[in-house]
Amino acid sequence: MSDKKEIKEIDVASLDSELAAARTLEEGKGDKFIMMASVVAFLMTSFHIYTGFFGLFDYSVQRGVHLGFALTLILLTQPLYKHVFKDKFAGSKAFRAACRTFDMILVILTWVSVWMAQDEVHHRPERLSKTTWMATFAGACLVIIVLECARRTLGYIMPVLALIFIAYALAGPNLPLAIAHRGYSLERICKFLATDLDGLFGTTMSVSATVIFMFVMFGAFLEASGCSDFINDIAISLTGKIKSGPALSAVVASGLMGSINGSAVANVVGTGTFTIPLMKSRGYKPQFAGGVEAVASTGGQILPPVMGSGAFLMVAFTEQKYIAIVIAAVIPALLYYWGCAVAVMSQTEIAHVTLMDPKDIPKSREVMKDGWIYLLIIAVLLYCLLVAQYSPLYSALWATCAVPVVMLFDKKKRFTLKTIPSAMVKSGFSAMSIVIGCACAGIVVGMVSITGIGVIFGDMMIQAAHGLLFPSLLFTAITCIVLGMGLPTTAAYVIAASILAPSLIKLGLAPLTAHLFVFYFACLSAITPPVALAAYAGAGIAKTNPMTTAVEACKLGFAGFMVPFAFCYNPAMMMQGSVGEIISVAISAIIGVAIMSAGFQGWLLWRLNWLERIVFIAGGLLMFIPGTLTDIAGLVIAAALLLVNVKKWEKGPKFIMDKHKAKQEQK
């Protein structure tokens, strides 16, 4: 089977639950259940706007209603008949009707269970903290429905992982001594998950029901306004006149949009449908074009100030101020994109890319004339977050409200009053997969909390690493990548943070450093084979082999794998230290990334042989190791090889002919 034929079989939308929901909404126009789902999504967004302005409800109500809306949306848009016996009974109307009836029963049970759970929490003081049968019933129903909805939207990995942790909680006394615990009954587990702050409605659901949803809504409104087109146009207008312009424009546009929407796969599909064909048309290989888009879109989740939803989860877990997390993430994120940009420029020379036709490059002045209003929207968000230092929830709310107000000045009328309801519906559909991921992660975190497996696992990891930091970091990175292969970034981060981050903190890392390390590798799973969803999406658009695209993405995004280890050993990379230390570390890292990029891509003014590539990579690694001697050694290696390649470059074509002639003479 050829690569081309193989790629045609890739269903890009199926790689991301948000894209699948959007496709369902588009295909199901006129379907009464899809219309019901649209109403539910509108009500969900209205609920969050109301609580954003007038104050949050009691935690059990706020988080319960939030979860109830998401579960209802999934049950309406992802009916059972699409996931069970779909081939055998696909054309049976009776089977479809039975499945729809079953789903509606689950919807009713969802809201009954949410009401029972909040009633238990509300009346618990009167009952002297004792729970009733309602807590057990609510917990059992919610766990079953959450797992089923997760199966329909996220696949089997997330619900199976949650079930493994529940089984661990049940089997405590019967396990080997090293991992044994007191054990809990099924009734106790159900009550805990329904009513405890470490259960389904714990920290993860709290962040989802407040900040994350608000930023999802902001992203939906911004997308509806046409901001993505403006970002694409401005990126091309700034970079289009240089050879590497098409690829660099993808890096810029995808990074900016990915920071807001928080989904690497959705961002690849959103911006990649424009950037990938553009790169291919200029001479880049298809796998390289897909890899660039995947790396740039994935990096959006680590790019301040929004960082997808990661920064807000870190605020909850580390109890650090939002501004502190943003500042700490600046240099690592810039190094990630610097590595990608240098790799793009190297590959441009290797591939003999042609310049864009000047007619296809929009003029910056014209782009800004039409799109300056988008800068006002971003300015409102940045002012609220960084200057006024409003809470992230309030900042996102005001930025969302700024969209329809600012767009009144848009001459093209791309956003009108009629656009608001559709943007609100899109907000609900975009959020549902995040909510279900957070709910499943809440089950895992709850089981970790009551069993103490996080402490047990952490102690085992420290013992296996003999108390050394590097092996512990390596094990944590691998675990995060494996978790992220089948889970959304938020869920992978939450689970890894609850199990692995405490042990890294025990080894001496600051809480913020440990959590940022975990979050980085949870994000990088999107481009890491064998299950690299962002790279697969890019391959689907580029019509090339997904595995070669994933490998190309890893080469392009190598800085993302190096930088987290570097900032664990050198806090100055996270802006923790004197100004001199921060500048020194930043310069060393910039040079180190450039050297390593040359090694990975095999180009520095001239093609590098394998020995030169290995030496360049080694030199770059030395620049990442803290210390003056290692920096000097790295610079000496780089300077020596640079001199060699300058001489090759000066000889030009004659150098190639001489080498070819020498080979022929040897033969």
Language-model segments: residues:
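Long, contiguous bundles of hydrophobic transmembrane helices that form the permeation core
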Residues: 2-35, 327-430, 533-621, 648-666
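Membrane-interfacial loop-to-helix junctions in multi-pass transporters
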Residues: 132-137, 197-211, 237-251, 282-288, ...
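Transmembrane alpha-helix interface/packing and boundary motifs in multi-pass membrane proteins
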Residues: 219-223, 254-263, 295-301, 386, ...
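Hydrophobic mid-bilayer segments of alpha-helices in multi-pass membrane transport proteins
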Residues: 37-41, 62-78, 101-111, 136-145, ...
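Conserved, well-structured core domains of diverse proteins
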Residues: 1-130, 136-140
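Hydrophobic transmembrane alpha-helices that form the pore/transport pathway of multi-pass ion
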Residues: 232-300, 310, 319, 489-521, ...
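Membrane-water interface regions at transmembrane-helix termini and the short interhelical loops
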Residues: 51-55, 79-95, 123-124, 141-156, ...
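Core transmembrane alpha-helical segments of multi-pass membrane transporters/permeases
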Residues: 148, 153, 163-178, 186-190, ...
